[in-house]
């Protein structure tokens, strides 16, 4: 069923009002973490649950647990009970009447198809169940199920994490149940108490017309910290909640458990699923950027969901990062010699945007530590106390967090970096809540800067005349296909397997260029300085792609018929009554030009306005774009003066279009492009240049870049 957008907006507003009312009046029980704001939901419940299991095991205590699952819970809750609960919780009468009137309008069409035709029942009224796609329905369900929490707590049965010998203190801190939406887990110190709690839950459920899904319900009995075989609990004649067998686990909120959490098995299961998803994403036809996004959103959460619940030794975290990079390299997403720190930086800063598992783990621990210290939940405070006093350093969230904080503070003191003014507006808040991530990113930038090979490009991007945002636009947009992105990043990092690189690694004796056999073969030499590649036309083809795009935009602006940009073939002379466009053609100047510079890439002569533009394009090495601009402006000054006199112009300008071979741009490039008719897009100029560089490198290196 498709829910109208207007209805979603309206129910969202109503949901906010109801939640605010419930929160102010403290009507909802803390045990329910579904729809609770400023809480970590399932992670909150799993923290408490894991501490109960750990406490029971360490102190050899008795514990009886039961997992209760409802059969089609969302579709079973009666509308009449929801309306009754709205009265109980003193919801505003207009809101209650609106919800009631909407429920009365809920209908469905039923069609039964058979061999002789079909039977159609229109407008069948719906008296049970709620939507599963709007903002209000989950909150209504939590309101309808909340009285169950109150009934369970009245029994004063449960498990206490409080070590006090006073019965009064233990009763005060009893944990009788945990509830997330309809996922219910019950706790008692013996089977008799558990049976009583199950009886309360069953009676309540039966009264409001909800049924247990017995095939998904189970119980577990622990005596003196060890699992024992218990008896099945009969809830009705012939209906039992079965005792969980020793070799069987129950999946509670996504985490398998029995009498304890088997951390080694859980780690291996998470690792296997993560690797499976990672390989599946890498084998897909997605672009490199979308592959990284898919890994961050679909693979990393398999691991991060259990951080803080499942014990992860640091060596396992590190090995997963290594395994990830190895798989990405095998599937040609990463290049084996590229700067690793760039892989984990955001794309807007020139990285690839991959989440490092080590960062995700440490940030999760620090965030949970902050959550434990700031959340006013009595059960969670007992969890914090247990982590601080009882658990080993490798399992304790506060202790691990202190280690990680100390580590990143030392790194930050050693590597002071100036943050750019382009940081997000909520930088201070992020720094307080997620300090490790913030400082680790600065640390990665520092390591990139100090890298002997990759640091050269980083230093170039930090120069005052460089357009940082524009220079990384190609990687942020992620348009390069298959292995092109990794090849270009490796070229920026001077990490391609050139002869110079192989000699530096001790693999080759000769470092001379495989084409010209004169200069040392480096990435910079291959992309812009090899005489043989120049003679073979590799640089010219790249240069002409940029010129062709600029020529196409000028023609479009002047109303000259053109094909699509990828089919455009510039002619030496293109003219209308008012405009003449010269392309790669010698311009008769009418007088001697001393330096012989009479053949710019494009000349636009507008007779009507008596103006002209001399446009010359260059795609030099990234480290030479400033020099190339000066050379172009100086080179055509004589031609500019000659044409001004010859054509009797009022205005004539030299427009240098300089783009680095791997995409680096000056901050004044946009101004130059804006002065060209049609205003060519800076990004399109960049992408034309870097695609030419990628094609050049593939042909030059052959199989050596694989």
Question: For the regions a protein language model found, what residue spans apply to each?
Answer:
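Catalytic palm active-site di-aspartate
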Residues: 1, 31-36, 63-73, 99, ...
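Domain-level recognition of nuclease-like catalytic cores that cleave nucleotide substrates
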Residues: 652-706
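Basic, alpha-helical interaction scaffolds
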Residues: 238-314, 332, 367-380
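Short, conserved micro-motifs composed of acidic
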Residues: 113, 211-248
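Extended C-terminal regions of large enzymes
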Residues: 320, 335-508, 512, 698, ...
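Catalytic palm subdomain of template-directed nucleic-acid polymerases
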Residues: 72-89, 174-206, 223-224, 261-263, ...
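Conserved pre-catalytic core of RNA-dependent polymerases
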Residues: 1-147, 151, 483, 492, ...
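Active-site metal-binding core of divalent-cation-utilizing nuclease and nuclease-like domains
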Residues: 507, 557-614, 630
